Regions:
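Phosphate/nucleotide-binding beta-alpha loop and adjacent structural elements of enzyme active sites
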Residues: 1-209
């Protein structure tokens, strides 16, 4: 997390977290520290699942799923990056190559994509148990948000990776994410950007809608 003091901006109690783009679950201690009672982890890269499972296996009400989240239902090629998978993405590299020339894609992995609203419907879980969404999917963050459909109204906080130029080809820019979330009364309250034009932002729901 780039925003290390994120908890200062959480003005409502956090119940559960939905974490899309889990990687190896490095944020699990933060969730434990700040009282999240449940965490759903989604990671499409099968190579990372054993590490993720080992990290969260003894944590109560932490579950992981080896699927990708998107607003379309299909199979797709996940481009696996050479930095232990951290920069893996469904999208081709854009200006990321300029700022991180050492990072490249080394192979593809066919993954299954599903929508978050569909996941909650077929899994029988209640999305009302989760009011915090963490999205780190290297360029397809807006697709993840759209996959919630109207269920996005159940959330209080959205913590997302953002970019202000095309770090990945055809990625959504922060202005597009701002505009989409504004439809549901989410306002960006804090942003931390890097010199490479990507960063993190916290969106908080203002009032009721």
């Amino acid at each position: 997390m780039l925003i290390t003091d994120l908890h200062k901006y959480l003005d409502k109690p956090c119940r559960g977290a939905i974490h899309v783009g889990a990687n190896i679950g490095e944020e699990c201690e933060w969730y434990q520290q700040y009282g999240f009672t449940k965490v759903l982890w989604f990671e499409p890269n099968v190579e990372l699942i054993p590490i993720l499972e080992k990290r969260i296996c003894e944590l109560k009400n932490n579950e992981f799923f080896n699927i990708g989240i998107h607003d379309t239902l299909k199979k797709a090629n996940l481009h696996i990056a050479n930095n232990e998978g951290q920069s893996s993405s469904l999208l081709a590299l854009g200006t990321h190559k300029k700022y991180h020339p050492q990072v490249r894609y080394v192979r593809d992995q066919v993954i299954r994509l599903t929508r978050l609203d569909d996941f909650f419907e077929y899994s029988g879980r209640d999305i009302s148990d989760y009011n915090f969404l963490n999205v780190d999917v290297e360029g397809t963050e807006l697709n993840v948000l759209k996959s919630l459909g109207d269920s996005i109204r159940k959330l209080d906080y959205i913590y997302s990776e953002v970019c202000d130029e095309y770090v990945r080809k055809e990625c959504a820019l922060i202005s597009e994410i701002d505009a989409y979330l504004n439809n549901f009364n989410f306002k960006r309250v804090v942003t931390k950007m890097t010199k490479a034009h990507w960063g993190d932002a916290l969106y908080r729901k203002e009032g009721k809608l």
